[in-house]
Regions:
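Pyridoxal 5′-phosphate
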Residues: 1-405
């Protein structure tokens, strides 16, 4: 089998290539807006115009008011601000209990752990075996001193989409603020903050073909988590620091483009996703899909290959020019099994052999077929050299023979 002449990039959940239009806007802002957007003279006003335009574009994409949108450095900062800022605000009302899921992004998980060390209490809701959080489980966990419910909109590893609207309704019924980490959702599926009914929502530009180092936090009017960064009066006095003018301009343009063609993008990525899932599960023995098939992000495939280590598969794929991952890029240096897979009941030894493939609008059916061709060659060859796989097959054969006696 011959390698493709170009690199096949299938790790769009980790980061996405910057859209040419967004890059063009970034260069335009860098070369043309040399002033500080807080300054009261012509070049300062020019810089502020880039910021205002970017803010309006992002707000429109999620059906928010520009005044409800605050720029940050990334999705992780937005998550930290929403969780810790709410905790510090509500602690003044003696509300020191928070609710989240057991398979959130580490920006949420580690923020919650930090709050626990400060004396806050956190309830972690276990997802179903298919990777969904049930609103009734959230409601059962709410207490009189609950300050916040934070449930991600779409899981970054297995792609399952959560019933955020229903969970928000439960939270509000009990007077609790609702936050969702929508980093994987914004630009990938429709996101309407009014329809969802959330109080806060996190996003990150580099997940929808914008630049790295740009994020935002939506805060519904009247919802103010305590500042984490103090200093100047930027972002309506809620997030100090001179704005990243070029990053904001590029973020706005990228999201404008992503949402303008969202239906076509979703249909295209869903076709690639379903092709890979169906073919791999049919042709590779004991391959298993992690997470339910619906509702699921259009671009997400997460499959376990028992008997193998994901890192081994990753290296083989790289040799064939395919870029993929074994899970979250934010935890790629760790050899620990994925907390996401463990939370949905995937055994540790199977979780170690999991691969995540995530598509973007630039990917083609030819690339999806090439991925399957490579997997159908690599997996059997690696299993033939795997003591873990061969031992498991021998054990299964012995049980089968005993059953026939």
């Amino acid at each position: 089998m011959e390698n493709m002449e170009k690199v096949v990039y299938l790790d769009n959940a980790a980061t996405t290539p910057c859209a040419p239009e967004a890059l063009e806007m970034m260069v335009k802002a860098l070369s043309g807006a040399c002033g500080n957007p807080s300054s009261h003279y012509s070049v300062g006003y020019e810089a502020k115009e880039f910021v205002d335009t970017g803010r309006a574009q992002v707000a429109k994409a999620i059906n928010a008011s520009p005044a409800e949108l605050f720029f940050t450095s990334c999705g992780s900062e937005s998550d930290n601000w929403a969780v810790k800022g709410t905790a510090f605000t509500k602690a003044r009302q003696n509300k020191k209990h928070l609710i989240t899921s057991a398979f959130e992004h580490h920006a949420i998980m580690h923020s919650m752990a930090a709050l626990e060390r400060m004396g806050f209490e956190v309830t972690y809701i276990k997802p179903t075996s298919e990777g969904y959080i049930r609103p009734e489980d959230v409601e059962a966990a709410i207490r009189p001193d609950t300050a916040l419910v934070s449930i991600m909109m779409a899981n970054n590893e297995i792609g399952t989409i959560q019933p955020i609207k229903e969970i928000a309704e439960v939270a509000h019924k009990h007077g609790v603020w609702m936050h969702t980490d929508a980093v994987q959702a914004v630009g990938a599926i429709p996101v309407d903050v009014k329809e969802l009914g959330v109080d806060m929502l996190s996003m990150s530009a580099h997940k929808f073909n914008g630049p790295n180092g740009m994020g935002a936090l939506y805060c519904r009017k009247g919802v103010w988590p305590q500042n984490l960064i103090d200093g100047g009066s930027q972002e309506a006095r809620h997030r100090a620091g001179t704005e990243n003018v070029a990053g904001i301009a590029a973020m706005g343009k990228a999201l404008e483009i992503a949402t303008a063609h969202l239906d076509e993008r979703m249909a295209h990525e869903s076709e690639l996703r379903d092709y890979v899932i169906d073919r791999v599960l049919k042709n590779i023995p004991e391959a298993r899909l992690n997470g339910g098939r619906s509702p699921r992000l259009p671009n997400n495939v997460n499959i376990s290959f028992p008997g193998l280590e994901g890192e081994t598969i990753l290296l083989d794929l790289d040799m064939h020019g395919i870029c993929a991952s074994t899970g979250s890029a934010c935890n790629s240096d760790s050899l620990d099994p994925s907390h996401v897979l463990l939370s949905i009941g995937v055994p540790e030894e199977i979780g170690h052999g999991s691969m995540r493939f995530t598509f973007g609008p630039q990917n083609t059916m030819e690339e999806a077929k090439y991925l399957c061709d490579v997997l159908e060659e690599v997996i059997p060859r690696r299993r033939a050299m795997s003591c873990m796989w061969l031992q498991g097959q021998n054990t299964a054969r012995q049980f089968s023979l005993k059953g026939e006696q």
